[in-house]
Amino acid sequence: MLSPKRTKFRKAHKGRIKGVTKGGSALNFGAYGLKALEPERITARQIEAARRALTRHMKRQGRVWIRIFPDLPVSSKPAEVRMGSGKGAPEFWTARVAPGRILFEVDGVAEEIARHGFALAAAKLPIKTKFISRIGDI
């Protein structure tokens, strides 16, 4: 799964995802893409599950680009622990995704295969998404 090799700080504030994405809203690598329509934190496990669903449907043809990276640590306290005594240990990594962000891109496959593959990948993600292509948003 994806995670940073090293970070400046071990723990991070929760924060909020406001407005639409600043960058990463256009296709840069592939012919087809999956665009986020809602703000959400997406975990490294969800990214990996979506990637697996997509690559298995494509039968390892073509190329897949993951355009988001989980660089935000999410901490949690163990079960049945009293409040206080500091912030919990980092449990998993997430990526902050704003509306309009491209999540995945593919190239080298037919549009129908890409469209169905993205539908399978989108089922693994906690947000609404949209299929886009270089020809025009469909």
From Swiss-Prot:
GO cellular component, one term: cytosolic large ribosomal subunit
Keyword tRNA-binding assigned: yes
Keywords: Ribonucleoprotein, Ribosomal protein, RNA-binding, rRNA-binding, tRNA-binding
BP GO annotations: translation
A GO MF label: rRNA binding
InterPro entries referenced in this protein's UniProt entry, alphabetically: Ribosomal_uL16, Ribosomal_uL16_bact-type, Ribosomal_uL16_CS, Ribosomal_uL16_dom, Ribosomal_uL16_sf
Subunit structure: Part of the 50S ribosomal subunit.
Its job: Binds 23S rRNA and is also seen to make contacts with the A and possibly P site tRNAs.
Protein family per UniProt: Belongs to the universal ribosomal protein uL16 family.
Record's protein name: Large ribosomal subunit protein uL16
Name of the coding gene: rplP
